[in-house]
Amino acid sequence: MFFFSTHLILKILFFWSITRNIFGATYTSLLLNNTINGNINDQSTAYYNLTWEGNTAYNVSLTLSTCTAFDGANDLMLYISNNTFDEALPLDNFTITASENGLATIFVTGYSPLYIAVSSAFSQFAPNFFVESGESTLEGNNVINYELAAGIDTPFSQYNATKFLFAQDTDFQAALLITGNLTTNETSIIPSYEIYVNPSNSTYDNTFNKFSSSFCAFQNNPSTVNTNNADRSMTLRGLGPFAKEQFYLKGLDPNVTYTAYLVEPNIGQPGGTVYPGVTFTTKTSPACQLIYDLQFCSEVAYAVPGNSSLFSASALAEWYDQQAYGYYQNFTYTLDLIPCNATSWSAYSLLKNCSDCANSYKNWLCASVIPRCADINDNSSYLIYKNYDSRYPLIDEVIQPGPYKEVLPCSYLCYSLASSCPLDLGFACPKAGYGLEFSYGEVSNVTGLITCNAPGVEFYESGSALLNISWRTFFISLIFWILFVE
């Protein structure tokens, strides 16, 4: 029994596919630090010679990106040699790579000229080896469009496997996506990122999924929603010291799962970087509306009890923010009566001060007055059904959202508040088994699952990292509570 490596099979297929016309092949010129667009029929090979001036060896990064293709087409193959292929084949003097998800990359150090071949022979329509050369098994417009690029050191097009686009939350017609931390805290300049969004498993999405590593595929194929349909802005919200770009997507359909891809075009040259896709599902009920960029409760970026027939998203955000700020302002008047600048002997705590108290109160207040809203048909055990009995009564009187389910505030917010503020203010938390479960939720250790609400809780944070932060705060607060409050 004989076993053949994929590399050997590619060589055999390449040898078979080009020997029929190798000696009469025409080589198209490709200059270093340039790109060229090409079209190739199924079962065909295209040839290029890469040249540059001088007798200098360069580290050449060669990329082949599939831009558009016919249904059923497999990925292309890329070959490079320092000999013409009629000379290279007998000497086995060439390098091969097969495209993966629409992108093939070869790094090679060499002198001018280098010889390149792009082949479509390795596809599901490849004829039997005993079929007459040049005979095709499929009729029709079997054309693949591609981009071939040759750069120095750094490839023109590349795929970055690090996840960099995250879904924060959705409502029944919108979604909020956010990038990871950028390299600056500058928020006045919006970077050049682009997004492409389609219903998962749709025709458009299947195309992007097949060529999910190819930059030109995103720019050459249609998309249901893209950067032109999104409200783009910058934010400092969330973890990390740097700015992030956020995309507010409108006009989505209820109860639909979407896949979004983030790409970053190069500045000053063709090509760009593609990042992994992210999926999200819009809510079913219009009782939840997505709000973000609040002035006071600035970490709020999630769906809240709403009513789109009475409030736009921006008006709803302003109403909630004003409610929270009004309570906070009154609280500061009371806190001003506390001798915050007292000596350590007369201070209310050796561990906490009035700034800690104010910050803990703000975090607790924003999560309590601005509930996180979930679909009425979501049967998750950590959700609480609300029907004209919202934790903040004015929600039912003014917003009138109708029935919805709430993600309760995290219990550690209450413990932090009680342990950070003077006892004279009277903050107390319900005990487990005596009302805590009906007022507060607990942090989950499942990645991406938000089982309780707190400022800054994000879908993209790993459950373990969030759990560590939350339980550290919880532990310190609980010890204080046991020693000094109960």
UniProtKB/Swiss-Prot annotation:
Which residues are sugar-modified? 33, 49, 59, 82, 93
Subcellular location per UniProt equals: Cell membrane
- How does it sit in the bilayer? Single-pass membrane protein
- Cytoplasmic compartment residues: 486
Alphabetically ordered keywords of this record: Calcium, Calcium channel, Calcium transport, Cell membrane, Glycoprotein, Ion channel, Ion transport, Membrane, Signal, Transmembrane, Transmembrane helix, Transport
Task: Write down the species.
Answer: Schizosaccharomyces pombe (strain 972 / ATCC 24843) (Fission yeast)
State which ranges are Extracellular (membrane side).
Answer: 25-464
* Function of the molecule: Calcium-permeable, cation-selective stretch-activated channel (SAC) that functions together with CCH1 to mediate calcium entry into cells. Required during mating.
Q: Please provide an example of a Pfam family that matches this protein in its UniProt record.
A: Mid1
User: What biological-process GO terms show up in the record?
Assistant: calcium ion import across plasma membrane
Where is it chiefly localized?
membrane
TM annotation in the entry? 465-485
Organism classification: Eukaryota, Fungi, Dikarya, Ascomycota, Taphrinomycotina
List the GO molecular function terms.
calcium channel activity
Domain of life here?
Eukaryota
Q: What is this protein called?
A: Stretch-activated cation channel yam8
Q: Which GO terms describe its cellular component?
A: membrane; plasma membrane
Q: Where is the signal peptide?
A: 1-24
